[in-house]
């Protein structure tokens, strides 16, 4: 918008100057925004502004009053410029506050939920098992999942005619290389490099050709070994009973040992616990027997010691093996082993 300069000829120049200054100050103080303020600055202080135009009124003033009038016009321009700058700062601050207010986050509003991860039930179960045996003085050892026939079978007194060597039970790469069917080879490797006394557990993945409600081609095992002088089956029963009662958090849990057969232990036993679902009354989970089979165990066979160079006349030992998924199913009430490997978040979130 362009304004014509105002040259007052009917009023005294000083009076006209005072009126314009008063009008300008009032307009500046009432300016609602920065664009309006800029228009006022141009209107009054621009090259063709109303205050600037008053310099042309100097010829209406006597020579004696001309310096006084010129000084008054300059002072009026400076004062108005200061008021415009002050008003500009106020408007800029108000605009900043308005913008901040519009961008403010209302912390009282409900937030967006975050997906929080958690430990897999098999991982939780492994951690509980390892914690108990670490407390009992056992070391944790690991070994290769791709094994040779010697460490997986022969060194464990499993003859070539044993069913475990059949193609339908074992994943073979060639005649001498396979995916380990248990973590017992770790025990052989440790005994080959460390002498007694030994207390170790070997957790890890194992592989067998099997798949149904209670079996998968890949699952987790923890196998344990203790070798020392004067070791008895009573020691084996004591450590396993303590473990099972600690794992299921039941001091009154009944544990029984049944005679069994494993080629790498003699004598051998299957370990059962009172059904944790029905407390021994009989239900679908335990097949109405009141008992659940949970692990196998026994005293280390002398031929196993011979393969690793340990004197079986001086040293005795016991070994045991348990399925991690089996214990997880019993602890968490899961009836299908395959659920652990389907990556269904609806299932997994129940444990976090």
From Swiss-Prot:
GO biological process assignments: phenylalanyl-tRNA aminoacylation
Principal subcellular localisation of the protein: cytoplasm
Reactions listed under catalytic activity: tRNA(Phe) + L-phenylalanine + ATP = L-phenylalanyl-tRNA(Phe) + AMP + diphosphate + H(+)
Enzyme class: ligase
Binding-site list for Mg(2+): 266
Cofactor(s) required, per the database record: Mg(2+)
EC code: 6.1.1.20
GO MF term list: ATP binding; magnesium ion binding; phenylalanine-tRNA ligase activity; tRNA binding
Cofactor note: Binds 2 magnesium ions per tetramer.
Top-level taxon of origin: Bacteria
Any GO CC annotation of this UniProt entry: cytoplasm
Keywords per UniProt: Aminoacyl-tRNA synthetase, ATP-binding, Cytoplasm, Ligase, Magnesium, Metal-binding, Nucleotide-binding, Protein biosynthesis
One Pfam family hit: Phe_tRNA-synt_N
Record PROSITE patterns: AA_TRNA_LIGASE_II
Protein's cellular compartments: Cytoplasm
Transmembrane segments: none
Assembly behavior: Tetramer of two alpha and two beta subunits.
Family, per entry: Belongs to the class-II aminoacyl-tRNA synthetase family. Phe-tRNA synthetase alpha subunit type 1 subfamily.
PANTHER family per the UniProt record, alphabetical: PHENYLALANINE--TRNA LIGASE, MITOCHONDRIAL, PHENYLALANYL-TRNA SYNTHETASE
Protein name: Phenylalanine--tRNA ligase alpha subunit
Underlying gene: pheS
């Amino acid at each position: 918008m362009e304004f014509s300069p105002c040259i007052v000829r009917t009023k005294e120049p000083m009076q006209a100057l005072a009126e314009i200054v008063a009008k300008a100050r009032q307009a500046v103080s009432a300016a609602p925004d920065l664009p309006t303020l800029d228009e006022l600055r141009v209107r009054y202080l621009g090259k063709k502004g109303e205050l600037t135009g008053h310099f042309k009124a100097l010829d209406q003033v006597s020579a004696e009053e001309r310096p006084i009038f010129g000084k008054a016009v300059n002072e009026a321009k400076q004062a108005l410029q200061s008021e415009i700058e002050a008003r500009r700062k106020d408007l800029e601050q108000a605009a900043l506050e308005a913008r901040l207010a519009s961008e403010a986050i209302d912390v009282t509003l409900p937030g967006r939920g975050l997906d929080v991860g958690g430990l897999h039930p098999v991982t939780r179960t492994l951690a509980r098992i390892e914690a108990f045996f670490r407390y009992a003085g056992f070391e944790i050892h690991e070994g290769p999942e791709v094994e040779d026939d010697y460490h997986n079978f022969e060194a464990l007194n499993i003859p070539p005619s044993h069913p475990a060597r059949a193609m339908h039970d074992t994943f073979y790469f060639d005649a001498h290389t396979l995916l380990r069917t248990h973590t017992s080879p770790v025990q052989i490797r440790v005994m080959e490099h460390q002498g007694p006394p030994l207390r170790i557990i070997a957790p890890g993945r194992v592989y067998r050709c099997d798949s149904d409600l209670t079996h998968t081609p890949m699952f987790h095992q923890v196998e344990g070994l203790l070798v020392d002088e004067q070791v008895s089956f009573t020691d084996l029963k004591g450590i396993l009973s303590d473990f099972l009662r600690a794992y299921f958090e039941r001091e009154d849990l009944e544990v029984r040992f049944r005679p069994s057969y494993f080629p790498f232990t003699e004598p051998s036993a299957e370990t059962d616990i009172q059904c944790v679902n029905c407390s021994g009354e009989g239900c679908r989970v335990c097949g109405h027997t009141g008992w659940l089979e949970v692990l196998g165990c026994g005293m280390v066979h002398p031929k196993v010691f011979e393969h690793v160079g340990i004197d079986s006349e001086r040293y005795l030992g016991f070994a045991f093996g348990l399925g991690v998924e089996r214990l997880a199913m019993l602890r968490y009430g899961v009836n299908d082993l395959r659920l652990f490997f389907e990556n269904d978040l609806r299932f997994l979130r129940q444990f976090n």
